[in-house]
């Protein structure tokens, strides 16, 4: 129906069976994909490997931060950091998408943070990675008393940059469109 979502990010799950040791694969991936956020979960029957520049949740004491990424441009000889910033700021689609994701993440944080503490500490900056420039913001807040880690995860997940906006109606649309639930994704 018209008007149910502003943006939807559909994905496809891939599975592979391989003789490659998951830990070896993770180590190789970490060397070639220099993403600051990476993890590996190894179970008896499966492994989950993730490498991403995006940080959905960081908690230190009563402080929580999130760093949404909405905007990516490939590095090349003509695209440096200053040109990337100009590209993002002058591209209406990139700016609107970034604002939408930042607003959604601030709203999610407001459910678990003390009133008036959710603030943008870095707004619309360009971060440089090996092959890409990303358009990022950093949001901080102070967690309310009696909020448990599971409450934080429930409030913040899934992140807006991987599903779209608004969160609840977009999740409902995704559940009807995608062949499998995203689970760990």
Feature-to-residue mapping (PLM):
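Extended alpha-helical targeting/anchoring segments
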Residues: 1-185
């Amino acid at each position: 129906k018209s008007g149910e979502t502003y943006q939807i990010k559909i994905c496809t799950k891939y599975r592979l069976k391989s003789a490659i040791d998951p830990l070896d694969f993770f180590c190789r991936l970490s060397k070639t994909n220099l993403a600051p956020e990476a993890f590996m979960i190894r179970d008896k029957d499966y492994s989950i490997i993730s490498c991403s520049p995006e940080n959905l949740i960081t908690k230190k004491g009563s402080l929580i931060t999130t760093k949404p990424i909405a905007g990516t441009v490939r590095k090349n000889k003509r695209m440096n950091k200053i040109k990337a910033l100009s590209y993002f700021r002058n591209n209406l689609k990139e700016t609107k998408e970034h604002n939408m994701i930042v607003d959604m993440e601030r709203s999610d944080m407001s459910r678990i943070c003390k009133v008036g503490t959710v603030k943008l500490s870095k707004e619309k900056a360009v971060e440089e990675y090996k092959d890409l420039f990303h358009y990022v913001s950093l949001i901080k807040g102070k967690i309310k008393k009696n909020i448990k880690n599971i409450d934080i995860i429930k409030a913040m997940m899934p992140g807006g940059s991987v599903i779209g906006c608004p969160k609840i109606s977009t999740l409902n649309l995704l559940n009807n469109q995608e062949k499998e639930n995203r689970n760990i994704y």
